[in-house]
C-alpha cells in the first residue's frame, strides 16, 4: 500500500517485483 515503487500502472500492470497496481500508481504493501 505504500507508493514507493516509482512506477505508474495506467495500463494496469507493474513491472517492479513486489509491487501491485493501485491505479494509476504501483504500490508496495
From Swiss-Prot:
Cross-link type Cyclopeptide (Gly-Asn), residue numbers: 1-29
Protein's UniProt name: Cyclotide mden-A
Protein's job: Probably participates in a plant defense mechanism.
PROSITE patterns the UniProt entry points to: CYCLOTIDE, CYCLOTIDE_MOEBIUS
Free-text comment about domains: The presence of a 'disulfide through disulfide knot' structurally defines this protein as a knottin.
Disulfide feature: 5-19, 9-21, 14-26
Pfam families: Cyclotide
Domain of life: Eukaryota
Family: Belongs to the cyclotide family. Moebius subfamily.
InterPro entries given in the database record: Cyclotide, Cyclotide_moebius_CS, Cyclotide_sf
Entry comment on modification after translation: This is a cyclic peptide.
Classification lineage: Eukaryota, Viridiplantae, Streptophyta, Embryophyta, Tracheophyta
GO term, biological process aspect, one: defense response
UniProt KW keywords: Disulfide bond, Plant defense
